[in-house]
From Swiss-Prot:
SUPFAM superfamilies: Phosphoenolpyruvate/pyruvate domain. This is 3-methyl-2-oxobutanoate hydroxymethyltransferase. Its EC number is 2.1.2.11. The keyword Metal-binding applies. The lineage of its organism: Bacteria, Pseudomonadati, Pseudomonadota, Gammaproteobacteria, Enterobacterales. GO terms for cellular component: cytoplasm. It comes from the Bacteria. It comes from Pectobacterium carotovorum subsp. carotovorum (strain PC1). GO terms for biological process: pantothenate biosynthetic process. The gene is panB.
């Protein structure tokens, strides 16, 4: 079996073949995910909340992401691994490159950055230096203090138009992938149709090219803070983790998940 690459994701978009992705933080789970058919994994700064117990992603450091990227890579050597760049590690292009290089050396295939068109020069700089970039728009958790909490984004016409413009700017700058979080389904479809690069949704309906879930949400172990867009696949699978992961991948690929009750308008 050959490694999964961004070329595979582009081909899947052209073929309208939906794909599932999930967060991973260690070798055991990344191996299990790959064995159950998930070929794309994100070492997310969500680990600040799910693994470290913080109330936001802001305390996560590059060293944290490096460590978990190394673990995930060992467990799934053929997966396409995305690694988050933590809060305040990409304020300037120069700072971004040194931080991104650490993640790539740790085993990442691509780095993910949160932000709109202001990031375009940074995305261009990284791409020119052979660092693939995944953008992240909509509800960007590192901006929680600006948003005043975890809220749906892009509901007004002006906000929706700005988000679409940001997505196009990131693609033009060289981004090869985009995560779209907590936006209305209609806006998610506009963005997905407008971009030639694959779009991965989370809380964006079933109209995007792929889906991602935080693994703890997919297993129903997030506690009282389970988001509306999440589904407990572990409960639906009788407590069998492997079956739960397989069901998640299957429902995404068949367009069953996310359903209407997991979507925003």
């Amino acid at each position: 079996m050959k490694p999964t690459t961004i070329s595979h994701l582009r081909q899947w978009k052209q073929e309208q073949r939906k794909f599932a992705t999930i967060t991973a933080y260690d070798a055991s789970f990344s191996r299990l995910f790959f064995e159950q058919g998930i070929r794309v994994m994100l070492v997310g700064d969500s680990l600040g909340m799910t693994v470290q117990g913080h109330d936001s992603t802001l305390p996560v450091t590059t060293s944290d992401i490096v460590y978990h990227t190394q673990c995930v890579r060992r467990g799934a050597p053929l997966a396409l691994v995305l690694s988050d760049m933590p809060f305040m590690t990409y304020a300037t292009p120069e700072q971004t490159f040194s931080q991104a290089a650490e993640l790539m050396r740790a085993g990442a295939n691509m780095v993910k950055l949160e932000g709109g068109s202001w990031l375009a020069p940074t995305v261009k700089m990284l791409t020119e230096r052979a660092v693939p970039v995944c953008g992240h728009l909509g509800l960007t958790p590192q901006s929680v203090n600006i948003f005043g909490g975890y809220k749906i984004q892009g509901r007004s016409e002006s906000d929706a138009n700005q988000l679409l413009a940001d997505a196009l700017a990131l693609e033009e700058a060289g981004a090869q992938l985009l995560v779209l979080e907590c936006v209305p389904v209609a806006l998610a479809k506009r963005v997905t149709d407008a971009l030639s690069i694959p779009v991965i949704g989370i809380g964006a309906g079933n109209v995007t090219d792929g889906q991602i879930l935080v693994m703890h949400d997919a297993f129903g172990i997030t506690g009282d803070n389970t988001p509306k867009f999440a589904k407990n696949f572990l409960a639906q699978s009788g407590g069998d983790i492997r079956a739960a992961v397989g069901l998640y991948a299957q429902e995404v690929e068949q367009g069953i998940y996310p359903a209407e009750e997991h979507s925003f308008h």
